[in-house]
């Protein structure tokens, strides 16, 4: 064993000596290379510098990698802390208590917890979503408020204008009679109903902005100012609901042929949640617009519903009830919540042709109207409820709530003229007016459903015909278009006969539509040849023999010519007018064109 140990020790000594010799030889070689590098003039120094730069770059890359790993480590630690924080409720409560006791959570009083290496407010972590929702709702409310203020400003400007310059800018060619129109909130969509049985939806805003132009052939017969075309978005049938036994099924027994009715009336909810459409069989359909477009959600018919064409539909301000008029001489009020008839206004003596709610702020005196009512043999003996008699509140229908009548004595002074929710004109919904084909014009009170509150009889020599009637902006006057090219003006203070007769040129034909302008001085009168903007004051002076004026009482609005005007729509700000052409199921021809006009205030 001793010999073996001596051999191992000697081998170890020999190995150590060999290592020392190799080290000495390496040092000698290095010194020789240094001397040779100095003799070469520093050529190798440049190589060494390059090597040093490469080494520096490598070191920088390693440092960046180390920093990235440190950041990843911190992120992982933060995620682990965040994950661990909600799971350990006891530690979470201790952290909140410690943070609250240490610094009072800053000036704002919010508790602070430490997540990872950062101090975060618990209110920011827990309530971030709620704060974002609150800020978005606040922003939306402020935007709606700005639009509402703009609408009021434009309406006030239109009310004090001396005159209006009306000119057409857009046209929608439709090869059918357009009997009805409806416009959604903020002029977003335009709905047109035709005698071909289709409801068409147009993008009205982009149409007004001129996003689509008419073709050369379409411009050929139109005024030069008309350049824009209507942007059609969709269309669908005005379908009449059928029983399963009455359906005509196809060969595969899965499809059926729909029964389509001409569209005689339309009324859309302000947010386009639904649209009401009148049918030829006396029914009324509620159809989806924003959701399930064109599908029928409800069918208003019932045993006591209309039996003939429904040509009038009007939603109330709350959009929970609507009025319907028909060729069966009946005027009904429906509840959208239950789908039932809540009121029937009786003793309507003719097919209804138009219906309008009364404007706010009527200045009619109570005693003056009562006296005039006694002198009028054709009017009702009791007219007090029309002008706010409190004793009539007990006689109102059980389904109705008491409503202010709209005269100044009933506290209507503070009511805004435009609704902030729907951006539509606010009316006095307790009083409305209807016109009939026999020439009758009736004033109705919602609390008197047994008969009209007032009946405005036509003047001597006027034929029994009236397609359209409208209120004056003041709520005291009514204008009725007649067949013999004239418009009769009625005053509620003297309802027994018309106070003025505004005559149009005899060649103009019957007056098919009238619309009062917001300054209470001008009236739009649509007849077969043209649309005229009448100055009522000048027209009255011209008709008076003692104060006869040489001024022409009207201006011709360019665009329309040679057809029956079925509707005139004036937007709440009085910036635009929409006219449709159609005979509404009666006599007359159509121009097959819907025109959109711009209004400039003067």
Curated annotation (Swiss-Prot):
Top-level division of the source organism's lineage: Eukaryota
GO CC, one annotated term: nucleus
GO molecular function, one term: TBP-class protein binding
TM spans (from-to): none
Transcription among keywords: yes
Keyword annotations: Nucleus, Phosphoprotein, Repeat, Transcription, Transcription regulation, WD repeat
Chain intervals for the UniProt region annotation (Disordered): 1-141, 366-418
WD repeat residue intervals: 173-212, 305-346, 415-454, 506-544, 560-600
One Pfam family it belongs to: Beta-prop_SPT8
Compartments (UniProt record): Nucleus
Family statement drawn from the similarity comment of this UniProt entry: Belongs to the WD repeat SPT8 family.
Other notes: Present with 8430 molecules/cell in log phase SD medium.
Quaternary structure and interacting proteins, as annotated: Component of the 1.8 MDa SAGA (Spt-Ada-Gcn5 acetyltransferase) complex, which is composed of 19 subunits TRA1, SPT7, TAF5, NGG1/ADA3, SGF73, SPT20/ADA5, SPT8, TAF12, TAF6, HFI1/ADA1, UBP8, GCN5, ADA2, SPT3, SGF29, TAF10, TAF9, SGF11 and SUS1.
Role according to the record: Component of the transcription coactivator SAGA complex. SAGA acts as a general cofactor required for essentially all RNA polymerase II transcription. At the promoters, SAGA is required for transcription pre-initiation complex (PIC) recruitment. It influences RNA polymerase II transcriptional activity through different activities such as TBP interaction (via core/TAF module) and promoter selectivity, interaction with transcription activators (via Tra1/SPT module), and chromatin modification through histone acetylation (via HAT module) and deubiquitination (via DUB module).
Record protein name field: SAGA complex subunit SPT8
Organism this protein belongs to: Saccharomyces cerevisiae (strain ATCC 204508 / S288c) (Baker's yeast)
Gene symbol of the encoding locus: SPT8
């Amino acid at each position: 064993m001793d010999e073996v140990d001596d051999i191992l020790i000697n081998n170890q000594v020999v190995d150590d000596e060999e290592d020392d010799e190799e080290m000495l030889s390496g040092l000698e070689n290095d010194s020789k290379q240094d001397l040779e590098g100095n003799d070469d003039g520093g050529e190798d120094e440049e190589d060494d510098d390059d090597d040093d730069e490469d080494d520096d770059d490598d070191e920088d890359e390693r440092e960046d990698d180390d920093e990235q790993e440190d950041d990843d480590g911190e992120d992982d630690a933060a995620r682990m802390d965040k994950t661990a924080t909600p799971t350990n409720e006891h530690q979470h409560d201790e952290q909140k208590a410690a943070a609250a006791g240490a610094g009072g959570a800053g000036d704002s009083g919010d508790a602070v917890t430490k997540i990872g290496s950062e101090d975060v407010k618990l209110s920011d972590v827990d309530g971030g979503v709620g704060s974002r929702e609150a800020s978005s709702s606040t922003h939306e409310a402020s935007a709606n408020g700005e639009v509402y203020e703009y609408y009021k400003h434009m309406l006030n400007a239109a009310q004090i204008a001396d005159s209006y310059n009306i000119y057409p800018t857009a046209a929608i060619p439709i090869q059918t009679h357009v009997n009805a129109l409806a416009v959604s909130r903020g002029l977003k969509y335009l709905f047109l109903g035709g005698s071909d049985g289709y409801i068409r939806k147009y993008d009205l805003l982009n149409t007004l902005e001129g996003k689509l132009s008419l073709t050369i052939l379409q411009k050929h017969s139109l005024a030069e100012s008309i350049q824009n075309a209507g942007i059609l978005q969709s269309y669908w049938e005005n379908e009449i609901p059928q029983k399963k036994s009455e359906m005509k099924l196809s060969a595969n027994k899965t499809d059926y042929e729909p029964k389509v009715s001409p569209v005689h009336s339309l009324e859309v909810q302000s947010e386009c949640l639904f649209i009401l459409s009148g049918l030829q069989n006396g029914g009324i359909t509620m159809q989806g617009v924003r959701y399930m477009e064109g599908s029928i959600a409800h069918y208003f018919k019932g045993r006591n519903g209309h039996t003939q064409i429904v040509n009038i539909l009007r939603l109330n301000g709350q959009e929970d009830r609507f009025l319907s008029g028909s060729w069966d001489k009946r005027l009904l009020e429906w509840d959208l919540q239950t789908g039932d008839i809540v009121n029937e206004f009786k003793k309507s003596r003719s097919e209804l042709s138009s219906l309008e709610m009364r404007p706010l702020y009527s200045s009619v005196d109570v005693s003056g109207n009562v006296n005039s009512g006694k002198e009028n043999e054709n009017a009702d003996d009791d007219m007090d409820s029309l002008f706010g008699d409190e004793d009539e509140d007990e006689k109102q229908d059980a389904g109705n709530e008491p409503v202010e009548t709209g005269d100044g004595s009933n506290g209507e002074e503070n009511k805004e003229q435009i609704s902030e929710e729907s951006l539509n004109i606010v009316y006095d919904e307790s009083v409305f007016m209807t016109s009939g084909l026999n020439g009758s014009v009736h004033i109705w009170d919602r609390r008197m459903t047994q008969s009209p509150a007032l009946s405005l009889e036509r003047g001597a020599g006027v034929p029994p015909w009236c397609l359209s009637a409208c209120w004056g902006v003041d709520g005291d006057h009514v204008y009725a278009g007649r067949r013999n090219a004239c418009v009769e003006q009625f005053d509620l203070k003297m309802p027994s006969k018309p106070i003025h007769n505004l005559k149009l040129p005899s060649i103009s034909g019957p007056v098919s539509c009238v619309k009062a302008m917001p300054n209470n001085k001008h009236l739009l009168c649509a007849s077969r040849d043209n649309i005229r903007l009448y100055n009522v004051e000048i027209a009255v002076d011209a008709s008076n023999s003692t104060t006869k004026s040489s001024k022409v009482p009207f201006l011709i609005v360019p665009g329309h010519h040679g057809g029956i005007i079925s509707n005139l729509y004036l937007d709440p700000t009085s910036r635009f007018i929409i006219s449709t052409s159609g005979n509404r199921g009666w006599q007359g021809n159509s121009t097959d064109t819907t025109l959109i006009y711009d209004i400039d205030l003067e």
